[in-house]
Amino acid sequence: MSEKQMKEAFVSNLNGTTVLEITQGLCFPAFCILCRGFLIIFSQYLCSFSPTWKTRFLTDFVVLIVPMVATLTIWASFILLELLGVIIFGAGLLYQIYRRRTCYARLPFLKILEKFLNISLESEYNPAISCFRVITSAFTAIAILAVDFPLFPRRFAKTELYGTGAMDFGVGGFVFGSAMVCLEVRRRKYMEGSKLHYFTNSLYSVWPLVFLGIGRLAIIKSIGYQEHLTEYGVHWNFFFTIIVVKLITPLLLIIFPLNKSWIIALGITVLYQLALDFTSLKRLILYGTDGSGTRVGLLNANREGIISTLGYVAIHMAGVQTGLYMHKNRSHIKDLIKVACFLLLAAISLFISLYVVQVNVEAVSRRMANLAFCIWIVASSLILLSSLLLGDIILSFAKFLIKGALVPCSWKLIQSPVTNKKHSESLVPEAERMEPSLCLITALNRKQLIFFLLSNITTGLINLMVDTLHSSTLWALFVVNLYMFSNCLIVYVLYLQDKTVQFW
């Protein structure tokens, strides 16, 4: 067996892990981000120096990226303990911040909480959405390289037919996260003009993805790089899936109201599942047109990638609806609490629906992107969003206690208007108003596509230079951390230099 065949076999015929374990793994970085905020506040209280871009980068990398690498590799069997540990650590930091509070030092806790709930917020963007996109991007980047090393648990890799692997969430989470900040969500007035102009711009935005998809295909075929055939097919890749999604969704949003995106998502998934169950569509995906697994012809060669696009369109529409809800103008802490509770209840309802669908209809299948897969992706995305929102609220409370606390990529606090004053008094320090958010989270959010491309390129280069199958645990851990450090540093420097590469 050649090395290419050995590497392909290493990531094939896998069945995944439990939904609960993946959910715990997703929530872990949300609490890491919360602890990051506490550490920044605590360090500002103890030390009065101004952090440089280097210290901010190292802080974010050590507190967020390194634990994520460990969670997907050497600490994979202790996710629940990690989660409990970071919660206890965060609670300890919050208690210390509360004890050292510089605001309302003589007021009892309930009075402080009452004042906090009346605080207003301001932010250029929603920190929870930014952190969601960063977490999914970082998880994906870590996994696409780590999966080729023995230290990466096989249960986290992409499943062959049915099951839930951590990497299965990566593709769906990427689509969902992109949908929450798509042009239709961010600029609703953009769709109120000429529909032809809107669709033309949508077509124009995908042409770079066409080159990226074709370029990736050409490189992989020319160097004989290992491929997982049943993932997308012979020629298809994730770039082509994104292209089709970005071509279909504008047409749907021209026909249907933007705020009814959830109905479109539900309709597509239900009709698609009915087609899988009551037509020959499922047989076509699994066995081709001749029933024996042929790869002759464009459709047979890429049947998984082409047909599963329907599921990703539904996930995108669900992301659009969530983005609309998240971007509504909310200016009070109380409003954020209601949003977090609503998302949490919606996620729980979807997880219950997932159980019912898996028992009575069909198990989760990334290969087909079926109904259960779509429900699982949306439910997991909402549970992560609600965790991040709750973390934002708790971090805002910590900032409320310490005068002048600066935490990049978090809500800015403003005192609620008082009847005898024309304007509200801002709690946002002047430094935070004038200084850009120099943090790794903001950089990865703004440069998500560059980070994704860079991760794919460096993963390929490392696989060509390193014998991943026979690497020791220590060496593999060093390589993966160095790979993430290099990619994050490049993206961070590009962000500081304000180098922007955007296609939509």
Swiss-Prot record:
The keyword Ribonucleoprotein does not apply. The keyword Glycoprotein applies. Glycans are attached at N15. Changing T71P: In GPIBD11; reduced protein abundance; decreased function in GPI-anchored protein transport. The modification Phosphoserine is found at S416. It is a multi-pass membrane protein. It holds the Pfam family GWT1. The chain crosses the membrane at residues 22-42, 57-75, 82-98, 132-152, 163-183, 203-223, 238-258, 261-281, 306-326, 339-359, 371-391, 449-469, 474-494. One of its GO terms (molecular function) is glucosaminyl-phosphatidylinositol O-acyltransferase activity. Keywords: Acyltransferase, Disease variant, Endoplasmic reticulum, Glycoprotein, GPI-anchor biosynthesis, Intellectual disability, Membrane, Phosphoprotein, Transferase, Transmembrane, Transmembrane helix. GO terms for biological process: GPI anchor biosynthetic process; GPI anchor metabolic process; protein localization to plasma membrane. Residues 43-56, 99-131, 184-202, 259-260, 327-338, 392-448, 495-504 are cytoplasmic. GO terms for cellular component: endoplasmic reticulum membrane. Its EC number is 2.3.-.-. Signal peptide: none annotated. Residues 1-21, 76-81, 153-162, 224-237, 282-305, 360-370, 470-473 are lumenal. It is found in: Endoplasmic reticulum membrane. It is linked to Glycosylphosphatidylinositol biosynthesis defect 11: An autosomal recessive neurologic disorder characterized by developmental delay, intellectual disability, tonic seizures associated with hypsarrhythmia, dysmorphic facial features, and elevated serum alkaline phosphatase. Acyltransferase that catalyzes the acyl transfer from an acyl-CoA at the 2-OH position of the inositol ring of glucosaminyl phosphatidylinositol (GlcN-PI) to generate glucosaminyl acyl phosphatidylinositol (GlcN-(acyl)PI) and participates in the fourth step of GPI-anchor biosynthesis. Required for the transport of GPI-anchored proteins to the plasma membrane. Acetylation during GPI-anchor biosynthesis is not essential for the subsequent mannosylation and is usually removed soon after the attachment of GPIs to proteins. Belongs to the PIGW family. This is Glucosaminyl-phosphatidylinositol-acyltransferase PIGW. It comes from Homo sapiens (Human). The gene is PIGW.
